[in-house]
Amino acid sequence: MKCKNWPIGVCSWSLRTDIRGVADAMKRIGIDTVHLGVRAALGAGGNDFLTAVQNQNWTISATMIDFPQEDYTTLDSIKVTGGVGPDKYWEQNQELFLGAADVTVKLGVKYLSMHAGFIDESDVSYSEIFYERIVSLADAAGEKDIMLLLETGQETAEELRNFLEELDHPAIGVNFDPANMILYDKGNPIEAVRVLAPWVKHIHVKDANRTTQPGTWGTEVPWGNGQVQSEAFLKTLGEIGFDGTLAIEREAGDDRFGDVKLAAERLSSVG
């Protein structure tokens, strides 16, 4: 299934089920491309997980690693717990990332995505350590001939672009999530994707409405029902020359399967 020339995929974690359940949902929707969460491959039962994945006739557009300490309850909680920023969990998270990189290579996938954490240039000591950690992970990815994709989220597009320009690393790109720009209240996603265009390798298809109370989360809604301006966003992707995958992500709502199916139908109907 495609939207124009872009493959349509789904984020495996959106379906909140095991590999067999993901496969069944994808078959019912009519898609064969997946953005695959791989933390389950790194613990007990990891080999069974990988075997189940390898038994599927999937195109894996990217893998994803998340970290156990991440707390998305509030904007403040994710600011201090997200990604590779917290010192207490750095060694554990570094090990998880390296394991995920090995899995990515084993599966023959080019991209490994993650939320890097909070980029805070105002705190020099934190910023230096954060920078060094990202460089070390990108170096490890590059040595394995894969690319680390940083997901948009807690910073404006300009802040992320400045960070990427400072890194100037060939093994770093961006997984652009337009809804996150709205959920975190960090700017207009259409303007943001233009700013980050040179780095954008992979897209999350997700929609949201901005909060009316500063300092609180926006509200995620089904694709096409929110403030991303889905048609204009897709048009912009064409204008910047994006040639990757559109991976549907749904992290809220009572009918995730139905919402993912709706998003796939809306995407595939775009001429």
State where each predicted segment sits.
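Glycine-rich, proline-tolerant flexible connector loops at the mouths of alpha/beta enzymes
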Residues: 35-54, 116-122
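Short, flexible, mixed-charge acidic loops at enzyme active sites
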Residues: 68-80, 211-217
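Short, structured active-site "lid" loops
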Residues: 58-62
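Glycine/Thr-rich phosphate-binding loops of Rossmann-like dinucleotide-binding domains
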Residues: 44, 73, 122, 213, ...
